[in-house]
Amino acid sequence: MDGKVGSTTTGCPVIHGGMTSTGTSNTAWWPNALNLDILHQHDTKTNPMEKDFNYREEVKKLDFEALKKDLHALMTDSQAWWPADWGHYGGLMIRMSWHAAGSYRVADGRGGAGTGNQRFAPLNSWPDNVNLDKARRLLWPIKKKYGNKISWADLIVLAGTIAYESMGLKTFGFGFGREDIWHPEKDVYWGSEQEWLGAKRYDGKSRESLENPLAAVQMGLIYVNPEGVNGQPDPLRTAQDVRVTFGRMAMNDEETVALTAGGHTVGKCHGNGNAKLLGPNPEAANVEDQGLGWINKTTRGIGRNTVSSGIEGAWTTHPTQWDNGYFYLLLNYDWELKKSPAGAWQWEPIHIKEEDKPVDVEDPAIRHNPIMTDADMAMKMDPVYRKIAERFYQDPDYFAEVFARAWFKLTHRDMGPKTRYIGPDVPKEDLIWQDPVPAGNRAYDIAAAKAKIAASNLTIGEMVSTAWDSARTFRGSDKRGGANGARIRLKPQKDWEGNEPQRLTKVLQILEDIATDTGASVADVIILAGNVGIEKAAKAAGFDIIVPFAPGRGDATDDMTDAESFDVLEPLHDGYRNWLKKTYDVRPEELMLDRTQLMGLTAHEMTVLVGGLRVLGTNHNNTQYGVFTDRVGALTNDFFVNLTDMANVWIPSKDNLYEIRDRKAGNIKWTATRVDLVFGSNSILRSYAEVYAQDDNKGKFIQDFVAAWTKVMNADRFDLA
């Protein structure tokens, strides 16, 4: 470990000072240190494409109809190395798409199909994703053919949608525009368990206590355990899990039944063999396996002998066509528990008619019992789900429509507003879960609006805080939130504690009048007021600047807003305004780091924003924590100057709070939180703080602050990209 080349005879001929797969990392030595890696993902060093490559422009050149035609052909082009069940890959492709999109959760907007992350660990090796590597490999010739014009993320979702079309479903539509990532995400918390299918994510016995933000019951599953809670069949208990997990994916009861039934109308489960004979998952597989996992090198392991979930059988009589057979079998037969050949619990019908049995995947002369999982039986046993299932059974057209819409929602939920959808099949209808915003006016007198704002009695802190609060809800994970729409003036945002409702009401009354007078949207005026505040603050510090501004934001209405769906965007903490709603188990600086990542900011952008906001008087409820200046309202680098000044000493006072005292005299000069002090204690953040504290970087500080501020204000302006 001394950085020298090891002996070529008895040692490893690698310079061990440069870590590859071995060695002790910094996080192993200092596990409690603030890990900034989640802010430094997906940069040009990992991306093989040219710096000016723009997928969203490239995909517009795609021959959409030719691609869809090729996907239709793929569905029935069975390959000997991985033969299609009944000669149709539809079920496999749908499962791939479902499991990509189904990892999304509303709490933080992470997961989902928007990045093509199923290609990488851990998802490519999850127990719930067994053999989906084969689906992606089957798609490779099409990806190879269309190249840069189609991302893996788009192709994975489109394949499932085309699969449904090829089996007779009229789909609701499709939007292209998902951009690929090139390495595993570092910011997604999948759970703390150290083993697959671990379930240490509940607080006691209540199934409602599933740890936030998780939306799956066990490590490595997408939703629920198909055999039952912790592998023990009990449809009513499983119904609780289904309701919680689908709810955390923003699905209501009707959408949940539709998705469960529609997903199981086609395809089958695979468990006709010994699961112990499967090889390692893709990440652990041997190099000669070329990224494929779960290979059975002992027995046949394909076709009718495939093992995936361990459950064995199809749900319906005709698993390659869209019909109402799922409800027919589920509701008309009694079911009993059986074990699959692989030893998994499954439900099979009692006294089923021979003609209602699906045929064997290879020999149509052989028929097998259909099966139901414990989650399927929940659709029959839970009274609410049962009522919905019976309606779907009686009205197949209604079921098909509800499912098509729910499938579209499932596969597009993390794409953000409809303006981001690309292609000829984008539905014209605006859906409330897309958080629609009307187009805003761009042709008003911006200078006149700024003059009216400057002449108002609003303070710099009031203007900047309101703009920040409006914009900070943006999540790069699912492209929700942000300032466009000015939903800060609507329920529930106007009443959030973090938005200081009393102060907000006062500011909005003034800004709404200015919007009316000038023809601007309230959304634009809110951001413009923040910019005016910053320009005033910079002038007070001796710098004349113009903060960039792009008009065109619209104002959403209550009718365009699903108020309940915005609850998950409520800030319960904001390190930028030095505020915690309450004390949490997670350290304040880690909470800020998570929020920073969701906003799409880097570590140095986080640093300069905190330092600037502290001196502008933007702390929540006007607290003085971290306000290391006697020139509040002037955009100075005082925060960094005083943070790095060794004439000061930092003394804990109470939980997460500190006093800054003169090292010699001992008098209290300022107070601070952990969020303030981390910029001097963390070695990386301190290196940034020192840059901004330098005498020659006062101008750079303002320049970088304005750039980071503008990035936040425009984060949801997809029309500017």
UniProtKB/Swiss-Prot annotation:
Q: What is its main location?
A: cytoplasm
Name its co-factor(s): heme b
Classification via HAMAP family: Catal_peroxid
Q: Which UniProt keywords apply?
A: Cytoplasm, Heme, Hydrogen peroxide, Iron, Metal-binding, Oxidoreductase, Peroxidase
Q: For this chain's UniProt record, which GO biological process terms are given?
A: cellular response to hydrogen peroxide; hydrogen peroxide catabolic process
Family, similarity comment: Belongs to the peroxidase family. Peroxidase/catalase subfamily.
Assembly and interactions? Homodimer or homotetramer.
Disulfide bond sites: none
What is the protein named? Catalase-peroxidase 1
Q: Cofactor note, please?
A: Binds 1 heme b (iron(II)-protoporphyrin IX) group per dimer.
Q: Which InterPro entries match?
A: Catalase_peroxidase, Haem_peroxidase, Haem_peroxidase_sf, Peroxidases_AS
The gene from which this protein is expressed is: katG1
**Which residues of this UniProt protein bind heme b?**
264
